């Protein structure tokens, strides 16, 4: 009796439930579509793709190298260390501007790669951010102390580094960064823009505990890096015909503060706090549209520091490169 009473009070119909789900989906899709086509751009220059769903397959490779030199208690030191290149494969999808992706690192799955790296990019019409964090024990290279050169192998030095660049796009109505780097927009006509930016690079390299245990007589070295830069640059999207898009961006910033330090066996040497030096942020991309549905391309982002000081000199080069193919569905 109770079941019969509940069925009378709360009638259930599979068709009615399906209708509710369909109405909710239609409403959500309408909201997403309105939001998707509400553009801050001049549509003579930048438009949204017509497909509701964009699928993309992407291969990426990243690398990082650091050169340093300095003098501590009359002992001259120099080094060149680089990480193993990280290769990932990802597949992603974006529906009306909402995106998700999944990445795998084949070398890590096989146990050959223990490093960790996170790269984040945010592209709006006015403001853009590129950020990366890397933790690596795959550093290798040479360290020289006076006349003695030591070969550093994997697991003998540790690196942690954080890079971030934020910039403002002045010609934000006609110049679109997203068109070149995530294909969420299409640049219809060539345009460029001046940029104002802020950059920071920070982190350290130090000899690992494993090396200290295996070679206790070797010098214990730590290199601390921190640069804050302010500057400006220019970016340009060149549209060739209706199929090609080429982007080149250069954003140099001037170092206004640093905390660079070299430590050998507990003795430290600091760089001048307000030394005049530079950080360079470069971008390049090529996108080819086979049709309104299919596209492919290459892109790269690099962050370089050029810091020269009589006490401590540090050059860092962090880069990431992508190759991708994609398709748009459901016009």
Stretches with model-predicted labels:
Residues 164-166, 317-331:
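Outer-membrane beta-barrel "beta-signal"
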Residues 58-62, 94, 103-107, 134-136, ...:
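Outer-membrane beta-barrel pore domains and translocons
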Residues 97-103, 126-131, 172-175, 244, ...:
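Repeated loop/turn-to-beta-strand initiation elements of outer-membrane beta-barrel proteins
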Residues 93-95, 104, 122-124, 168-170, ...:
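Residue-level signature of outer-membrane beta-barrel architecture
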Residues 53-57, 100, 118, 127-131, ...:
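Transmembrane beta-strands of outer-membrane beta-barrel proteins
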Residues 75-78, 103-105, 147-155, 182, ...:
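Extracellular loop and loop/strand-boundary signature of outer-membrane beta-barrel proteins
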Residues 51-53, 83-89, 94, 112-116, ...:
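Residues that define the transmembrane beta-barrel architecture of outer-membrane proteins
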Residues 119-223:
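Outer-membrane pore/translocation modules
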